[in-house]
């Protein structure tokens, strides 16, 4: 890949609406519950807003991102607290069985072929290690694809890809159901979808901030590092609904998948 993702990356001091901050906080609160005394890798870490939360109880934390300029922002904030690696998620520069947990949040659909990343994740995870993914749901009724994205997997397609890559014990969850949204929130979703379908380029830069102000009015700056207190206040009450793996979900805006790396023998059977 040679794409520059800085324009679509949430950076420190970017203005976010409350739902964006909630999603950001929730994903790292969830990740933090899985990483105690583990060797952890976050892939597509961006500017590293969640690294402090993940690092509270880990044995080791490494973060990787494709964009050097974005990774340098994380480096400027964290200095040498954690190893930061610039690399391609499709070809991860780590030895086999190097990590116990891998987290990748809302990034699969920027990859030319996310199956390469899944196979690489299986390779560098220990047997029984954990992969935690979050993805925007393409079957959600207000879904609009983002700029620079390639392919959004549906829940069944992602589940099958994970099985093919050698993962087991798959669990699928949804958050932010449209059925629970207020009439005003649903109106905002309709307007956002209409505007972005008419002009996708408005999703970046000054246009994006203007759109957010028009739709949401109250915007807050993204922190360089989420604190436990702030994250709990913004994302601690999110309900995760278990979902079936074999059919699309049209209700939830975001999907989470939690799964385990199968044994080497199982991985070979999945990829004969």
Segment roles from a protein language model:
Residues 115-127:
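A short glycine-rich, Lys/Arg-flanked "PGG" loop and its adjoining helix->strand segment in the class I
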Residues 106-110:
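Short catalytic micro-motifs in class I SAM-dependent methyltransferases
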Residues 103:
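A conserved beta-strand element that flanks and buttresses the S-adenosyl-L-methionine
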Residues 177-272:
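A C-terminal cap/extension of S-adenosyl-L-methionine-dependent methyltransferases
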Residues 142-161, 179:
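Acceptor-substrate binding/catalytic loop of class I
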């Amino acid at each position: 890949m040679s794409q520059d993702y800085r324009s679509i990356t949430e950076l420190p001091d970017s203005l976010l609406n409350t739902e964006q901050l909630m999603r950001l906080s929730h994903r790292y609160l969830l990740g933090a519950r899985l990483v105690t005394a583990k060797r952890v890798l976050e892939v597509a870490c961006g500017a590293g807003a969640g690294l402090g939360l993940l690092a509270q109880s880990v044995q080791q934390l490494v973060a990787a991102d494709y964009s050097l300029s974005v990774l340098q922002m994380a480096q400027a904030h964290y200095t040498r607290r954690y190893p930061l690696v610039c690399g391609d998620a499709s070809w991860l520069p780590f030895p086999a069985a190097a990590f116990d947990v891998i987290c990748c949040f809302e990034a699969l659909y920027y990859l030319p072929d996310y199956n390469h990343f899944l196979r690489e994740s299986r390779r560098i995870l220990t047997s029984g290690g954990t992969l935690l993914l979050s993805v925007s749901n393409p079957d959600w009724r207000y879904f609009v694809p983002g700029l620079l994205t390639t392919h959004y997997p549906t829940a069944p397609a992602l589940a099958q890809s994970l099985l093919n890559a050698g993962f087991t014990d798959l669990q699928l969850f949804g958050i932010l159901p449209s059925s629970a949204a207020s009439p005003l929130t649903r109106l905002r979703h309709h307007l956002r979808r209409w505007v972005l379908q008419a002009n996708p380029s408005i999703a970046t830069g000054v246009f994006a901030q203007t759109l957010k102000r028009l739709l949401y009015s109250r915007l807050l700056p993204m922190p360089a590092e989420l604190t436990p207190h702030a994250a709990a206040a913004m994302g601690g009450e999110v309900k995760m609904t278990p979902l079936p793996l074999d059919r699309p979900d049209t209700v939830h805006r975001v999907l989470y998948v939690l799964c385990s790396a199968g044994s080497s023998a199982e991985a070979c059977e999945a990829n004969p």
